[in-house]
């Protein structure tokens, strides 16, 4: 891992997130998504066609993780191919560093940014993950990070595998939407990690731990966020909690408590981690490497040498939790 002068790391961080850093408020603004067409058969919509699209994800990113887990749970990886960017961001953006020759085998590009520019030659923002490319053109056509999982659930339903879980039951959709919005807004360590003022940091810090307390109480009497079965709300929460356990506590300074200090949240996280589709796409070591070693993130720790911490000890993630007792149907998730 190469040495980075502190000013170099800070400059990379500032440049990467320049479109979101609000110098007036000291906060990080929500991302603006340029490629926001919906899937469907209407005019101007993206046709729902097997083997036409490629999901691009990066294992360190929580929003990427949501999309990948949802794709896997629903069996859509049979009809939508997957490309994976490396966890160490280049100054120009995400790169396909783990592929042979550093080139995505389908899109034939090294930088994800090239697919964004194919989608819009005037694009000047930050190329983000997850993103969906049309393999017939090589262009990014959809990058709404928060909504891609829901599109997979609703718009791609006819291609779900047999006995796929219902992650968005109609009778619970309002509740799921409200809880998912709460999770994305409040269980948001980035509000602290990317704060540019003490006031912004403190506001995010208080909000973060108040929200964790609320969910700790909720999970005392139910196995999953919405009851007996995993829904989209759980996917939103899980990817945030597992990163709190691995990195956020250290890297973003949300250190009032550890995840283990919340018995219900800790057991809940382990319960979900042990579920097929979650375990296999939660790449613990890559998540840790992303937040601690990616050049654009190293400023958060003053980690000029790109060193990697040894902890945490993740063996407990595989121990039994007993949370199935909270479910009316303990044998099914």
Model-derived regions, located:
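C-terminal alpha-helical interaction module
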Residues: 1-333
């Amino acid at each position: 891992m190469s040495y980075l002068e502190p000013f170099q790391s800070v400059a990379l961080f500032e440049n990467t997130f320049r479109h979101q850093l609000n110098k007036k408020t000291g906060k990080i603004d929500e991302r603006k998504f340029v490629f926001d067409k919906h899937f469907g058969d209407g005019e101007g919509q993206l046709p729902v066609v097997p083997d036409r699209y490629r999901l691009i994800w990066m294992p360190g990113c929580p929003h990427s993780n949501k999309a990948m887990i949802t794709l896997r749970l629903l069996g859509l990886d049979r009809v939508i191919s997957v490309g994976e960017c490396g966890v160490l961001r280049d100054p120009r953006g995400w790169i396909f560093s783990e592929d042979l020759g550093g080139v995505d085998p389908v899109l034939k590009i090294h930088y994800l940014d090239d697919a964004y520019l194919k989608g819009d030659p005037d694009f000047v923002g930050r190329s983000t993950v997850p993103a969906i490319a049309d393999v017939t053109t090589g262009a990014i056509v959809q990058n709404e990070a928060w909504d891609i999982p829901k599109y997979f659930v609703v718009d791609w339903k006819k291609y779900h595998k047999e006995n796929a879980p219902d992650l968005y039951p109609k009778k619970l959709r309002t509740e799921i939407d409200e809880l998912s919005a709460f999770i994305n807004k409040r269980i948001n360590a980035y509000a602290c990690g990317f704060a540019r003022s003490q006031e912004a940091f403190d506001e995010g810090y208080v909000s973060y731990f108040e929200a964790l307390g609320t969910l700790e109480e909720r999970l005392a009497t139910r196995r999953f966020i919405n009851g007996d079965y995993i829904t989209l709300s759980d996917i939103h929460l899980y990817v945030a909690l597992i990163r709190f356990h691995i990195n956020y506590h250290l890297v973003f300074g949300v250190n009032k408590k550890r995840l283990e200090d919340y018995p219900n949240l800790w057991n809940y996280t382990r319960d979900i981690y042990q579920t097929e589709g979650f375990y296999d796409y939660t790449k613990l070591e890559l998540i840790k490497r992303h937040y601690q070693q990616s050049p654009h993130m190293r400023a958060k720790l003053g980690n000029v040498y790109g060193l990697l911490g040894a902890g945490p000890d993740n063996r407990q993630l595989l121990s039994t939790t007993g949370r199935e007792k909270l479910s009316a149907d303990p044998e099914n998730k």
